[in-house]
A protein has these predicted regions:
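Structural core of flavin- and non-heme-iron oxidoreductases
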Residues: 1-284
Length: 284
């Protein structure tokens, strides 16, 4: 779950209190089905502010597996010791030091625990995953389940690329123009310039929701005439709405991978193939 400061910054920037972190956290609770805090732990459920009735199952790895692997147990122990040491030296107040350590332990190193989110505590934590009974359970699986239950209400088209959003004279979206065929996107290594695809249109009675990712969402808006006028005119696109911010200020958090060579092998993952099993083959 993001830092509260991320949501609060957007709320301030847009002058829209609905983006405030306390309000946005309600949506997280609506979609989450936390499976690693049992029902009988009433106070843990209450203080963590997780969601327990949503469609997205969340779980954490079984810590008892550490008992099977002394090397992995040693690594986790060293990481925890370093995390505690860092927190101890960066927090001047000794009472706050102890409080932070206790808070980490009481929250089971859960990065989605509300108290940790609110204080933005750094250091060692568990990694929540969207897995249910050993199988991946994300947006894809949810959509497939809904399509199976309500085939008349949800249609999913594969190999389909939206070209632009259709806007009326009042710049209200009333549909999309799209084409069907594989490898249409030019960034696809299998894309061929010679291929042609028939354009089709789909119309809506309510609204068009654009959810195409950090890069394709602004691209689709600009192809539809929504974006900085100078750039749209450069590509001979009629400007419907002049919004200079579209396609700008794309940011992400830094991720730095660290590769280390261990003196000892990790027994727990010995023999793992790290790939889907073949037909008749047992999974890792």
């Amino acid at each position: 779950y993001p830092h509260n400061s991320d949501w609060d910054y957007i709320a301030k920037l847009m002058n829209d209190p609905t983006w405030h972190s306390k309000n946005m956290h309600k949506y997280f609770k609506r979609l989450e089905r936390c499976e690693y805090i049992p029902k009988w732990k009433f106070w843990s459920r209450l203080w963590s502010r997780h969601g327990f009735d949503g469609w997205l199952p969340t779980s954490i790895g079984d810590s008892t597996m550490l008992r099977q692997d002394k090397v992995l147990k040693k690594l986790i122990g060293a990481a925890f010791k370093e995390s505690i040491s860092e927190s101890w030296h960066t927090t001047p107040n000794p009472i706050k030091r102890i409080f932070r350590i206790i808070l980490k332990l009481r929250s089971r190193l859960d990065p989605n625990h509300w108290r940790l989110i609110r204080r933005n505590l750094e250091g060692l934590s568990s990694i929540p995953v969207t897995i249910h009974q050993g199988r991946r359970a994300g947006t894809r699986e949810y959509l497939q389940r809904v399509r199976k239950e309500f085939p008349d209400n949800l249609v999913i088209k594969a190999n389909t690329l939206v070209q632009r959003v259709l806007l009326d004279e009042h710049n209200k979206a009333y549909g999309v123009e799209y084409s069907i065929g594989p490898h249409q996107y030019r960034a696809d290594p299998k894309h061929r310039k010679a291929d042609t695809f028939k354009a089709e249109k789909a119309f809506v009675e309510r609204e068009v929701i654009i959810s195409a990712g950090a890069f394709n969402t602004p691209q689709l808006l600009m192809l539809s005439g929504i974006g900085p006028r100078d750039e749209l005119e450069e590509h001979h696109i009629e400007t419907k709405v002049n919004l200079p911010g579209v396609g700008k200020n794309l940011q992400d958090r830094y991720e730095v991978g660290i590769v280390s060579k261990l003196k000892e092998n990790i027994p727990l993952i010995k023999g793992m193939k790290l790939r889907p099993p073949e037909a008749g083959e047992e999974a890792d």
